[in-house]
Amino acid sequence: MRSTEVVIIGAGAAGLMCALTAAGRGRKVLLLDHANKAGKKILMSGGGRCNFTNMYTEPGNFLSQNAHFCKSALARYTQWDFIGMVAKHGVPYHEKKLGQLFCDNKSSDILEMLLNECDQVGVSLHLDTSIQTIEKLEKGYLLDTTLGQVTCESLVIATGGLSIPTLGATGFGYQVARQFGHELLPTRAGLVPFTITDQLKELCTELSGTSVDCLVSCNDQSFRENILFTHRGLSGPAILQISSFWESGDTVEINLMPDHDVPSWLQQQQAERPNSELKTLLGEIFTKKMANLLADNWFVSKPMKQYTHGEIAAIAEKLASWKVVPAGTEGYRTAEVTLGGVDTNEVSSKTMESLKSPGLYFIGEVLDVTGHLGGFNFQWAWASGYAAAQYA
C-alpha cells in the first residue's frame, strides 16, 4: 500500500496548479489522471494557443448560485500572479482583445511550464490511472486504484465537468461529491453554440461561415462581439457568452447593427438616397450575400423612397432587434464549460475544503463556478487550485 499526504485526482489546469503549489510548500503530492496525457483541455484551448487568463478578471465575470464564493480565491491568486509565472518561464504571449491573453506559439508552452514546475517540486504524476473506490478513514482517505491502494491525508477533486467528452470528461467528480453528502446543482452545457430548427435554419445554412459584429441579449445580459452563422445554427463569441444565461424556450435578441441608431439611419438613407435599394445599402454594412439574403428573406427590397414610415419601422425592428428562439444547444460535445456542479454553499471559499467531509477538497470546473468566455475559466482553475493547495 502506498501512503502520501495529498492525492489530487485530475491533471488538468486546476489539478496541476494545486499539485505544484502544495508540493512547493513541502507536501508529498500524488497527482492521478485516467487519461493518457495531462492537460488535454489546455492543449486544445484557444485554437491551440491557450487563452490562459484575462487581464480584467474580477468576480463579476463568473456565474454561480453563490456569487460571493469566487471572490476570496480570485483575490489571493490573481491574473497577475499567473502572468508572473508565464514571464518567469519566458513563454511569449500577447493580448488578442478584451484582456484575453494567448500564447504567441502554442498551448503546449503553458502545459510544459506547469509540468516543469511540478517536476521541480517533486510531484508524482501518474496517468492512465483509474479510481475504483474511495473510502473515508478516521484520518484521511483510502483509494483503490489501478496503481494499487493509496492512503492520503487530503484528497483534492479536480476532475472538471462534462464538457467535451472526447477529451475524457466524465461525471466522476460529481459521483465523489454525492458519495460524501454534497448537493449537486443541475448541470448543463455552457459557452456553447445554439442549434436552430425552424425557418431560420435555411438562412443560417446559407450564411454558414459568415461572421458579424453584433450585440446579443438574453435575460438582462448583453454581449457585444461577433456571431457566426453555422450549418446547425448560431455560434461565435457573442453566442457562446449568452448561451450561459439562456434557458430552453428563451428568446435571444440580436442587434445586427450595434454601431447605428437603426431607425435614424434608415430615415437618413431614405432622405439622402431615395433611389437606392435597401439591399444595396445593407451591402455597405454586411457582405453582399448576407445583404441579399436578409433583403430577400425579411423584406421586399425596393428603392428607399417606396417604403412607408411603418415599413421603415418594421425593417429597423428586425435589424436592431432580431428575435431568435434557439431549438437548443450543441450540448457537452462542443461546450467549453459545464454550468452547475458541486454546491459552493457546502465548500469553504477560503480553503476549497468540503464542509461535509474534512480533508476533501473541490477545485476548478467541478464546482458551481463558471467564467465568461475569454480566459476567465482558466483563471478560476489557477486561483481555486492555489487556494486549496495552501491547506491540503
Spans of model-derived segments:
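Glycine-rich active-site loop/strand segments that organize a redox cofactor
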Residues: 49-95
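N-terminal Rossmann-like FAD-binding beta1-loop-alpha1 element of flavoenzymes
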Residues: 4-31, 388-392
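Glycine-rich FAD pyrophosphate-binding loop
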Residues: 23-47
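A conserved FAD-binding loop/helix module that cradles the flavin
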Residues: 163-176, 180, 369-392
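A glycine-rich dinucleotide-binding beta-alpha-beta segment and adjacent secondary-structure elements
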Residues: 127, 292-370
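Feature captures the FAD/FMN-dependent oxidoreductase FAD-binding
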Residues: 76-154
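An anion/pyrophosphate-binding glycine-rich loop and adjacent beta-alpha core
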Residues: 36-38, 43-44, 52-59, 92, ...
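Short hydrophobic core segments
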Residues: 7-9, 32, 131, 150-166, ...
